[in-house]
Amino acid sequence: MKNRLTIGLLLAAIYLFWLLLSAPARLLALTLSDDARLAQTSGTLWQGEAHQASWRGVELAYLRWEFGFSTWLPGWHIRFNDPSGLRGQAWLHGLNEFVVREGRLVIPARLISQRLALGMPLEARGQLALTLPEASFNANGCRRIAASAVQWQDAALSSPAGLLELAQVNGKLSCTPAGALAVALTQDSHQLSLTGQGVLTPDGRYTFNGTLQPRQAAPALLTLLVAQNGRKDEQGRIPWRWQGEWLSEEKK
């Protein structure tokens, strides 16, 4: 009797383990927050893909995931390569407070400019490359970011005021005590010098505070517009403040 019970429990455990391993990928959608969505899924919880995914209004195609280990920690390795040019990969660990490791993200600059309430026709060129060795987030937003780097490569801005050619824009990400995402930027080209810090809150509001300094090679109309924005300091820099709300797909 005892042997039969042991065998029965063993078979039940094997069956449950098999059910867990073969759990369909669509169950993953049940664990996501309200601002995230997966559709047209295939595979399992442990290795699969979604042909449609979105997070806070950002749409992705062909999101793939695979369970594994990074630095001896269990987690999911995700990667995506959207037709828009947005692509990236990272390791995700944890549930309530998740940790991002070995994150790399490439974003066409035009995608970001389309999400900002600029108030004037402005086309951003180039691409942003983000490296995120380690970061942690929870329901309240950003908790910690270590040794990050942001680079705007082949940077340029096209507007009715003229074409503004930028040097490579360098930045560093951090978290504010309130859980917002902050980025410190520097850029110095033959047309414009720019320094400042931007903040993006969990509810999608952003602000940027910094200084601008047009160079001699800057378009004349742009120099005039910048000069009207404020008074120069003793080094010729003009204060610049910019704020707005990150536009969802519906508001674009």
Curated annotation (Swiss-Prot):
- Cell inner membrane: is it a keyword of this entry? yes
Q: GO cellular component annotations, sorted alphabetically?
A: plasma membrane; type II protein secretion system complex
Which InterPro entries does this one have?
T2SS_GspN_CS (IPR000645), T2SS_protein-GspN (IPR022792)
Which loops or segments lie on the Cytoplasmic side of the membrane, by the record? 1-4
Q: Name one GO biological process term.
A: protein secretion by the type II secretion system
Pfam families in the record = T2SSN
Q: Which keywords are on file for this protein?
A: Cell inner membrane, Cell membrane, Membrane, Protein transport, Transmembrane, Transmembrane helix, Transport
Major subcellular location class? membrane
- The source's superkingdom equals Bacteria
Where exactly are the transmembrane stretches of this chain? 5-25
> Where does the protein end up?
Cell inner membrane
Sequence ranges on the Periplasmic membrane side? 26-252
Stated family: Belongs to the GSP N family.
Protein function: Involved in a type II secretion system (T2SS, formerly general secretion pathway, GSP) for the export of proteins. Required for the translocation of pullulanase.
Name of protein: Type II secretion system protein N
List the source organism: Klebsiella pneumoniae
